[in-house]
Amino acid sequence: GKSTLPGHLLDFSIGQYDTYTPIQISQYINTIANGGSRLQPYLLKEVYESSKENKEGFGTKIYEASSKELGKVDVEEKYLNRVKEGFKAVVSYGLGTQYMGSYQSIGAGKTGTSQSFIDTNKDGVVDTETITTSFVGYAPYDDPKMSIVVISPDVADASAETTSGIDKRLSSEIVNKYFEIYK
């Protein structure tokens, strides 16, 4: 924003009024996990032909996505490592425990909560305050193999049990399943 009012400056300093897509949030966490290298995201990793001999298996690989570096964050490694240590602390013994499922000890991440407002009866008037909760993380901490972004928009029940419970259940099940498949 362009406002210089003291209250607005405080809001801006913590990211209030900023909006990001899940892909942008994913790039953010992956840039940190990758030591400051910002990589181009892709949604499809590999494509295989069907196997004629084995109905359960894969045939020949016909496509594999390649990594492309889009840029490098200009920051000293010690500062980037400090952020990573903070992310590790969040899931190890902070408010982010249980978000990494059975892999809490090897993960890193960040929780988030923001105010949101909606028009509940579609009359053009924003009439209800809600919150949007989020969790973003990666694992393993020392050699990242996966990352996750969970965003729960417009949660009406602002109790801590409800808000964090949604993201915890989703992220922990996804992380557990990932490591079950890719041991």
Feature map (PLM): residue ranges:
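HHCC-type zinc-binding knuckle of retroelement integrases
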Residues: 72-73
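Active-site beta-strand/loop architecture of penicillin-binding DD-peptidases
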Residues: 2-69, 78, 84-183
